[in-house]
């Protein structure tokens, strides 16, 4: 892709024409390879493929326009289905279920329609860095059988703004 093509894609709204769907950062931080998550369920992509984020912020937001599916009782993870039919699972940290909700506050509700950037869960990062096995947060696509192409991005990301994954169905 040349410079002009890249610039055109930045100012153009024809993403739907190309069939590319962008997954936006559900939290601020640094992208990490999913294979580096210290949990076999995520590292071996048992629940889906994607990326992980080492968080620096204090909230998880909707990474797509869509509908919140399940928010775990302990408020450490949620699922969302995008308007384009992509099913995503965002899971804060590893073994954070053992904290029984400590450090997490639910903002959104199950079944709620959300837009990219709408807050779903707030969290206390210093507390979770102290108590959780890991704060690496997997962001995975759980209906990979419907995905033709998955492009994982890298680098620092800003909650609700920076793309982390581009996919084609």
Swiss-Prot record:
Gene ablation phenotype (knockout): In mutants defective in enzyme I and histidine-containing phosphate carrier protein (HPr), cells lacking this gene are able to grow on the non-PTS compounds such as glycerol, maltose, melibiose, mannose 6-phosphate, and alpha-glycerol phosphate.
Cofactor note: Binds 1 zinc ion per glycerol kinase EIIA-Glc dimer. The zinc ion is important for dimerization.
Protein localization: Cytoplasm
Transmembrane segments: none
Swiss-Prot/TrEMBL site (Important for phospho-donor activity) positions: 76
CDD domains the UniProt entry points to: PTS_IIA_glc (cd00210)
Domain PTS EIIA type-1 span(s) in chain numbering: 39-143
GO CC aspect terms: cytosol; enzyme IIA-maltose transporter complex; membrane; transmembrane transporter complex
Binding site residues for Zn(2+): 76, 91
Modified residues (Phosphohistidine): 91
UniProt keyword terms in alphabetical order: Cytoplasm, Kinase, Metal-binding, Phosphoprotein, Phosphotransferase system, Sugar transport, Transferase, Transport, Zinc
Disulfide bridges in this chain: none
Pfam families: PTS_EIIA_1
Coiled-coil segments on the chain, per record: none
Active site, renumbered: 91
PROSITE patterns given in the database record: PTS_EIIA_TYPE_1, PTS_EIIA_TYPE_1_HIS
Cofactor: Zn(2+)
GO molecular function, one term: kinase activity
Primary location group: cytoplasm
Domain characteristics, as noted in the entry: The EIIA domain is phosphorylated by phospho-HPr on a histidyl residue. Then, it transfers the phosphoryl group to the EIIB domain.
Subunit architecture: Heterodimer with glycerol kinase (glpk).
Function: The phosphoenolpyruvate-dependent sugar phosphotransferase system (sugar PTS), a major carbohydrate active transport system, catalyzes the phosphorylation of incoming sugar substrates concomitantly with their translocation across the cell membrane. The enzyme II complex composed of PtsG and Crr is involved in glucose transport. The non-phosphorylated EIII-Glc is an inhibitor for uptake of certain sugars such as maltose, melibiose, lactose, and glycerol. Phosphorylated EIII-Glc, however, may be an activator for adenylate cyclase. It is an important regulatory protein for cell metabolism.
NCBIfam families per the UniProt record, alphabetical: PRK09439.1 (NF006962), PTBA (TIGR00830)
Protein name as catalogued: PTS system glucose-specific EIIA component
Organism: Escherichia coli (strain K12)
């Amino acid at each position: 892709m040349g410079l002009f093509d890249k610039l055109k894609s930045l100012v153009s709204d024809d993403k739907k024409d190309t069939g590319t769907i962008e997954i936006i950062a559900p939290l601020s931080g640094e992208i990490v390879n999913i294979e580096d998550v210290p949990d076999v369920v995520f590292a071996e992509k048992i629940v889906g493929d994607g990326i992980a984020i080492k968080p620096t912020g204090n909230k998880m937001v909707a990474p797509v326009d869509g509908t919140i599916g399940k928010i775990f009782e302990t408020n450490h993870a949620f699922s969302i289905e995008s308007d384009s039919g992509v099913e995503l699972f965002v899971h804060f940290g590893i073994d954070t279920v053992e904290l029984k909700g400590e450090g997490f506050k639910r903002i959104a509700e199950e079944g709620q329609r959300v837009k990219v950037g709408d807050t779903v869960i707030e969290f206390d990062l210093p507390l979770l860095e102290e108590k959780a096995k890991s704060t690496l947060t997997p962001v995975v696509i759980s209906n990979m059988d419907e995905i033709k192409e998955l492009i994982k991005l890298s680098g620092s990301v800003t909650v609700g703004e920076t793309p982390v994954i581009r996919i084609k169905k």
